[in-house]
């Protein structure tokens, strides 16, 4: 599922439904940094950039922050304390506007950081895909315990970030993956989700945008990555490239291995989070390389209120359960051939 949609209860329900209705083993992977949203247990804190933005803005506008509302560097903040801080800032800004000391049409932007559960951080993609692949390898090695065929089919279903991870798994270990059904995957690395977007433009690149009456709070996942070329954690072009699904040379190398059947659904109006133009370019490239691939671009006529609920933008509020009901049976009926001497290693240029 996507980063905003991951929910233990929901995914468990889907897994149980699939296991009960189809002859499959369902694998849910608690991969690295899977819980980096507030409703899933993540915490709010202010790093040095967040504090600098907050402090400098308040000083410029002569807004006094009471000691109990003043965040401490890298210290978790309870949700109630965060809401009190927001309320205080909105109240002060309203007063300034009433006194015509501030542009009444402008909303001020502040930032905050998101601490995932288990004290993890956003590595983005690579470690998460490796967690999934390690879990797959474990199940395949112990196939008898899971009542599977000796060479079981491996099918990946994903939504948004989960869809991206499904495609990344196939890039890293094509011999393991037979089929992918995904909705709304991004195929390039979104700067907003790497964690250091605030270093570049804190009003533009962020995980979460909370637009309130007088302020906009932009949340960023905790990350070690930085745009600083002198840092050992610099997010270099090579780090970007290995995570990029659309890289032309990498796709050519992938195509020389076992090719997964790839079925995608995407919203015609998804222009920011996962631009539909990039998904079209991806599928055009796959077709030229001999993949069995299909891209469904949802438009207004596809809205049925059940499977696809809207085409306003990213995700379409698609029913994952109905996606599985639609796409899983034909995949289970299909035979996937593997060469006896197929390569089980892959290397990509940086």
Segments the model singles out, each with a brief description of its role:
Residues 86-115:
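Long, low-complexity, polar/charged, intrinsically disordered or flexibly structured peripheral segments
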Residues 1-94:
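Short, surface-exposed "cap/lid" segments of acyl-processing enzymes
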Residues 137-199:
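Primarily recognizes the serine-hydrolase "nucleophile elbow" in alpha/beta-hydrolase
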Residues 205-350:
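Serine-hydrolase catalytic core
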Residues 15-22, 144, 169-176, 255-256, ...:
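Short, surface-exposed basic-aromatic patches at helix termini and helix-loop junctions that form
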Residues 2, 160, 268-269:
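Residue-level signal for short, function-critical loop segments
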Residues 27-29, 155, 181-183, 263-265:
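Hydrophobic/aromatic beta-strand patches that form the interior of the parallel beta-sheet core
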Residues 46-88, 115-130, 137-155, 176:
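Gly/Ser-rich "nucleophile elbow"/oxyanion-hole loop immediately N-terminal to the catalytic nucleophile
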């Amino acid at each position: 599922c996507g980063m905003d949609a991951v929910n233990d209860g929901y995914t468990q329900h889907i897994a149980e439904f699939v296991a009960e209705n189809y002859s499959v083993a369902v694998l849910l992977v608690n991969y690295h940094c899977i819980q980096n949203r507030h409703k899933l247990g993540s915490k709010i804190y202010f790093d040095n950039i967040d504090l600098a933005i907050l402090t400098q803005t308040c000083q410029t506008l002569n807004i006094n922050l009471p000691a109990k509302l003043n965040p401490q560097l890298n210290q978790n903040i309870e949700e109630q304390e965060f809401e009190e801080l927001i309320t205080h800032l909105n109240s002060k800004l309203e007063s300034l506007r009433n006194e015509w000391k501030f542009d009444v049409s402008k909303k001020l932007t502040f930032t905050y950081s998101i601490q995932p559960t288990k004290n993890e951080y956003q590595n983005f993609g690579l470690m998460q895909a490796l967690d999934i692949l390690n879990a797959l390898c474990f199940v395949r090695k112990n196939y008898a315990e899971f009542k599977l065929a000796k060479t079981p089919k491996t099918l990946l279903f994903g939504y948004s970030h989960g869809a991206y991870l499904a495609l990344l798994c196939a890039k890293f270990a094509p011999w393991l993956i037979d089929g992918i059904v995904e909705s709304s995957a991004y195929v390039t690395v979104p700067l907003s989700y790497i964690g250091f977007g605030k270093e570049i433009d804190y009003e533009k690149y962020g995980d979460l945008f909370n637009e309130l009456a007088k302020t906009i709070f932009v949340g960023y996942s905790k990350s070690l990555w930085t745009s600083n070329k002198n840092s050992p954690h610099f997010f270099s072009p090579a780090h970007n490239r290995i995570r990029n699904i659309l890289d032309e040379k990498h796709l050519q190398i992938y195509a020389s291995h076992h090719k997964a059947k790839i079925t995608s659904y995407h919203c015609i109006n998804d222009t920011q989070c996962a631009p539909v133009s990039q998904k079209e370019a991806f599928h055009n490239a796959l077709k030229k390389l001999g993949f069995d691939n299909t891209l469904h671009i949802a438009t207004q006529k596809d809205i049925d209120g059940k499977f696809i609920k809207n085409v306003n933008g990213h995700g379409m509020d698609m029913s994952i359960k109905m996606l599985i009901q639609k796409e899983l049976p034909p995949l289970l009926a299909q035979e996937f051939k593997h060469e006896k001497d197929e390569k089980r290693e892959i290397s990509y240029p940086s």
